[in-house]
């Protein structure tokens, strides 16, 4: 989530639910107040910070995931420090492997990543998790997000995949 939707009361309630070590919400926050909205268009910094604080203060485990571009690469250390100060349990800065977006430049000294030819480790099986998209739809994993043909309506259907070697036929 970019953390920009809902109220602090809502995030506080979610924080009470996501309070186990294996439960967490990833907040995609790409820089600091002056740069986050360059990629996260129309996202209000103060709302994101208030929502994240409400979630964390209610006991929720929050992860900060930062996409690094040329315009925000100088803020990685400051963002990581802010994440610690706020009580985030984890911070990751990463360069997007997606096709470049108009107006956004890769950071300096960036090189195309080498293709990974090793085995794929399924996060759903390892973490016993699911993915909820920006519209609140439930999917078996983040790799299948926005694929309406694999939309799940019941969390028990996702839980069944946690005890198998193949979480979803689409993953074959």
Question: Where are each of the predicted segments found?
Answer:
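Accessory C-terminal segments flanking Radical SAM cores
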Residues: 88-92, 96-172
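Radical SAM/AdoMet-radical enzyme domain recognition
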Residues: 1-94
